[in-house]
């Protein structure tokens, strides 16, 4: 509610993901127009894979599916060879794009512009966020920060299990995300205290 991005740090198996999904469900109940997205980037190995996962997660999911929304998305992302598939059970479309190395920054900008132009309140949880520090591209943090800071209607939850890496990313004055988000540490609940 304070309109700040949040950094959520806890060891694995403490309940970060469950907490994020619970908060998203509460947000959707209290604000039905709000859009909430969750993506786990642990399996991504570079910026290109990150951008493709982000596109698959959010593109086409912000608005209700219509022909005009479909055309708008295809036009906006036409240079990335968009492909559309439909979930066989729900019929909900899923978009994916092919991005060349030269198109990475431009495609990320287009995705964030798409979110900004929606005008809707959007929350995006990026789990295992420390993974971006392992990418071979050294400027990933700066690239993301340069876009994220100009999204007035999009809020991020940066979740991670590596306390050292996450703290370094958000508390070191030399890093792009320095003091950009509110820090929250989760620790195990004492069984004796709550049972």
Regions found by a protein language model. Give the residues of each.
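N-terminal pre-P-loop "Q-motif" helix
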Residues: 1
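P-loop NTPase nucleotide-binding core
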Residues: 4-5, 10-14, 18-123
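Conserved Walker B catalytic segment
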Residues: 5, 94-162, 171
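Active-site catalytic pocket residues across diverse enzymes, especially alpha/beta-hydrolases
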Residues: 27-31, 148, 173-174
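Short glycine-/polar-rich loops that comprise or flank the Walker A/P-loop
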Residues: 32-36, 152-154, 179-182
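Hydrophobic residues at beta-strand termini and immediately following loops
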Residues: 39, 184-186
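Short regulatory helix/loop adjacent to the ATP-binding pocket of P-loop NTPases
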Residues: 163-181
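Conserved small helical "lid"/interfacial subdomain of P-loop NTPases
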Residues: 186-195
